[in-house]
Every structure is written in C-alpha cells, then in structure tokens.
Amino acid sequence: MDDIVMLGASQLVAGFMQRTLSPVEVMRAVLDQVTRLDSVVNAFCAVDEQRAMSAASDAERRWVRGEPCGPLDGVPLSVKDLVAVAGFPTRHGSWTSSPQREGEDAPAMARLRRAGAIPFGKTTTSEFGNKIVTDCPLTGATRNPWDTRLSPGGSSGGSAVAVALGMGPLSLATDGGGSIRIPACWSGVVGFKPTFSLVPAGKAASWTALSTLGPIARNVRDAALMLSVMTNEGIDRHSGIAGSSDYWADYCAGLDDGVAGLRIAYCAAPAGVRIEPAIEACVRQAARALEALGAHVVESDVTPLADYYGDGCMHSVQWSVYFAQRARHMEAAHRTLLDPDLKALADAGEQVDTATFADALLARHALTAAMEVYFQRYDLLLTPTFHCSPQPVPGLPAGLRTAPALTAWCNQTGLPAASVPCGFAGGLPTGVQIIGRRGGDALVLRAARAYESARGAFPAPGATLERPADGMEAQP
C-alpha cells in the first residue's frame, strides 16, 4: 500500500507542519485508495471528492501561511452514516431514510471540522446500527479487509475497514453495544467507546440511552487526539455529567505515562461465554505485557458480569424496545423495506411488556452499581473484545448479531472501553478490551497506549483483495 495512506493523523499533521507532506497530496492519495479498494470491501456509501479536494487546498494554504485552524487541519476523516455531516445525506443504511443533504453537522462533527478535519465520505452501517455485522438492504454487505469472505463486524464496519485499509486515518463512529469496538477488533485497528455523554451526540443518539460517539483510528494516540477535539468545548450541560476533571482533559496529555502501579484485573475467559482458545491466549499475553510494565495484574472472575453473561436479556430487551419505538413511527409501507433482522428485532420489542422492560432497567442499575464497587478495587479491567474470530455474515447466529455479551455491558453501565489489536486467532486479528471506571477515559487510553507500545507495530491487511461472488450486494 501507498506509505502516505497508512500514516496516522498525528504523523500527517507533523508532516504538514514540517512541509514534507501536503494536505492536497494526502487527500488525493486517500481518495485514490478508495477508488482502488472500495469496490471490493464496500466501506463507503458516499464520497464527495470535489468538496474534499477543495477543503484540502484551503488547508494547504493555511499551513503555507503558518496558520493552521486546529490540530487536525487537513486530516481526512470518514464518518459513519448515522452521524449528520453538512453536505451529505444521513441514510442510516435504510431505504426508509431521506436522501436530502444535511444542512449542518452533528455537534461532535462540527468540532472536528473546526479543528480542520476534512469529512470526505460516509461509511456503511447496518440499518440504524441495529446489529454487530455491517450489512443492510440499502448498501449491501461490508467485507473484512483481512478476508473478504468474512464480516468486519458492526455496526461501524465501514469505518473500521476504511481505517484499516488506508482510506483515511480517522473515522467518527457510534457504539450502542459494541459497534465501535467489535469492528475495530475484527479489522485490526483501535476503537474507543467513551464514557456515556462525554461526546455530544446530537441526533445520532436521540432515540437510545445506550449509544455514544467515538473514534476509530490506527493507533491510540490518534484516537486520543480525536477524542480531545470532540470534547474540547466541554460537554453540553443537559447531556453530560459534571464534577470530574477527566471530562475536560487533553487526552493526549500523560498518554505515555505508563501503567506502573496501576491495579489491573483481567478476565480472559469470562464465565458463561465460550472464548476461542487463541483469543484467550492473546488476552492473557496482553495482561502479562502490562504486568511487565509495572502494573499490579490479577486474574478476576468479575462476579457481577457472571450473572449478566448468564442472563443476557438486559441488553436485548432494551435494544428491541428502542427499535420497536423507531419502527412504530414509520409508515406501513416503509416497514416493508426494513432489513429482516431489524424487523424481527422491532417485532420482538413490541412483545415486551412494561414489567419486563422495568426489570431490564432495574438490572441495568444494579449492574452499574456493582461495577462501581468493582472499580473501587481495580483501576482497569481487561477482557476479550469478542469471543470468536471474524465470521461469514450468514454464519453469525441471529442472537449474537444484536446482543454481544462482552461489549454491551459497557454501554449498560456507561463505562469507557477501548479495543486494541492484541494478536491473531486463525490468521485473523483479535483485540483486547480495556475498560475503566466512569469518567476514567484518560486512564483507559493511557493503558491502551502502554500496551500498544509494548506490543510493537501491528501489521496492516494485505494489499490484494478479491470480492467473492456470494450475493451479498445491496437489495433494490
């Protein structure tokens, strides 16, 4: 692959500053990469080359004058198609959506744009982000960059694939149950789900109390830089939680301070979840790496999560009710256009009675309280990000598509969590999930960076991709 397209955002900015790279040169290389590869992997549902090149020219002039508009000036950015970007439609992966272009950015996108990031394309998603694979009737299936017969996970699969293949160093995505972390794990990149409400969501999370916006990047430093930009004006008072200085932090500050003295628990094989042996081994190796860096590392069974893994209904009940609510407001003709998986999810939500939903909410509060106690004993927790290697879309059981046990509990509790590549299982990438207490985003990123540094450079997917003829295209 072209070396330029595999540079991280921080490296690009350093090159712009030193005049060894030009925003126009970089954007042109990224767009050429999209042209070369996206017909195979289907990571993008919209690209605006003309606006992107015009914005890159503007950024280049600012760098020549020595007046960059912000810390991401000239950096290409892709955005998941659940997030509003001015000049692009927000289709949500759905035939039921409007093709009309947005007049303004979502709040987090507006902050990234003011910092100089250039949104050049929208990435694919499952319909309304309903499942952890990325396929929908509108855009078809997105393919794993390591093996195009397989899924990259979801619902932010387009974002993860784009970053993995050099189609932009950063992507803005959403996570309602693992939708950032799972595709990051299966694509071999870094994904970070911030503390709930840390990043202003706007309309992207107006209908669910589980989802948050976050970065997908090729390295932890870039994820921290992107998070710093998205939170640099503080959180909106109506949607945020005051009282923690961590909410106002520069997430790049102290990123290289290491993990010496931290209390880190790990659970490589959670009770109630069958983990592939190679994935379990990778997580244990990650724990040993942090121990070698001076952390106090212990194996833990995480008792509160044993009940959650064994039950599994808490997330699926809430998730189905949220989608039932969305479908209820659609015209009858639009409901017939929905992805069958989404329709089945909404139909299941219609069958949930008030008592069952109340029980799910009470269980959520109980788990949140239990994990608050747990994180009084430990600073961080390590688990696998996902229990198995990437699967063919038809091969992933329907239940797992919407209720990922290892990641969804972080959405239930609002805790920050990162997925960092930690090795390979069967020749395919896997990830370790690093979880912190509420508001402890900086510490999660610091540990992720420490592990990343100890691990060394993670390889990129091969440059040769072939699209199999398996009928996983968009449905008219």
Name the predicted role of every residue range.
Residues R36, R114, A164-P270, R284-L293, ...:
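Structural helix-boundary/capping segments
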Residues P23-R28, S57, D250, P277-V302, ...:
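Acyltransferase
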Residues M1-M53, A292-G294, E350-Q351, A460-P476:
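An N-terminal boundary/leader segment
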Residues L72-H92, D256-A268, V317-E372, S419-P429:
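Short helix-loop capping/hinge segments that flank enzyme active sites or metal/cofactor-binding pockets
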Residues V30, A52, G74, K80, ...:
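Conserved hydrophobic/aromatic pocket- or pore-lining residues that grip, position, or stack substrates
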Residues Q11-M17, S57, R326-Q412, P459-Q475:
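Serine-dependent amide/ester hydrolase catalytic core
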Residues T20-R28, V34-S97:
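N-terminal, positively charged, Ser/Thr/Ala/Gly-biased leader segments
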Residues L72-L213, C267-A269, T383-A398:
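Short glycine/serine-rich loop/turn segments
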